[in-house]
Amino acid sequence: MGPAVESPEKVKELIEAGMNMARLNLSHGGYEEHQNRLDRVREAAKAAGKPIAILVDLQGPKIRLARFVDGPHELERGDIFTITTDEVEGTKDRVGTTYKGLPGDCKPGDRILIDDGKVTVEVVEVKGNDVVTKVIQPGAVSNSKGINLPGVAVSVPALSEKDKEDLRWGMKAGADFIALSFVRNAADIKDVHAIMDEIGFRIPVIAKIEKPQAVDNLEEIVAAFDGIMVARGDLGVEMPIEEVPLVQKRCIELAREAAKPVIVATQMLDSMIINSSPTRAEATDCANAVLDGADALMLSGETSVGAFAIEAVATMARIIARTEEGGFEMIRTLRTTPKTKGGAITRAAAEVGAIVGAKYLVTFTQSGDSARRMARLRSPIPIVAFTPEVGTYNRLALSWGVEPEVTPMVKHTDEMVKQADTLLIQSGRAHIGENVVIVAGSPPGIPGSTNAMRVHVVGDAVGGVAPAYR
């Protein structure tokens, strides 16, 4: 979300074009601005009758240049350029940085990338608070441009003071997900959970994979966090660019195996910031992410500041739909066997559904866990998830192939089946006499207690009679 889609009309158009989740990037803008955006999304989602998740994306400990007196400044190859932790007015030769630990983390020979690698400098020496560098790749530098140190394990905390305040705001504002930037290992989630526990509840945390250390610790990160974002922007700066496609595939594979949603982000349709149609390479990139098994594809500048925001969403939605329609069998099946009771039951339900020709796979879920386990299987049978929790309803918008519905809590399994009958028939999803496979926990109301599967004939629980031709 951003200036290009501020009006209620634009938000409505985004949803109509295919948006499932709105991202609030707290690297830019104030709380009032983001609260207004969140409120507009909630209002438009309610009017459309669709689940739309809200993702609050924390800036993270991004290392940046400080401000220049004037500028931007063009650096030429061979120029000496000093980055200092002193409070200085920036010039072409010397500028400050937001990261006070920079001199301690650098050594001669290290390369520093500025503005996503548009400018490259090499450390010549470290003198007190100054990191003296020589320009290797020339280009322009200006206020607050990001700094990357490939291969250097910078000693920054997982959460900056700004991130802590932003997290508290996001929780109170009603976010469905929090995205944590520059995750390095599983322990990075501890500070997030500590603040959530102070507030009194937790919401899912998405780990942004954009550092080499995160790639090295990918399995433990997937286990500790609630989802993954393949943040290819910084990842492609911090690592050799040729590694990024393989990292993307591994992230998706591990997240799917763990039944956790995975988002592929950055430059998906980048040319649509200024053009009304994407490049062929961008269209293919989107399709390949779908075939890799991603749950969601993310647009950034395309919709926040782009000239063709609505068109970008509609274009991406068409690419996704066509890829799934024509290439569904190319999506890799999971190679792992279920490790939990819930995993075994959802897998069995998908297999039985295929055998009996089920119209839908139906899950009753409080936490969304059984729906996510079903989604990772990529069954061609659509999934309906009935939940009494509005938060779960919104969050399941991120999971592949799930159609969530809010339903009242019931106390008995038979009541759940009646609910399924009533809602499937009323919504027109299924007709009397058709088969569905229902997955639930018995007794109802206990999160994570999936232990039952049944093949159900629609209408049986409400006294329906199938047409004779069936």
Residue ranges and their predicted role:
Residues 1-470:
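Non-catalytic helical/linker scaffolds that mediate oligomerization, partner binding
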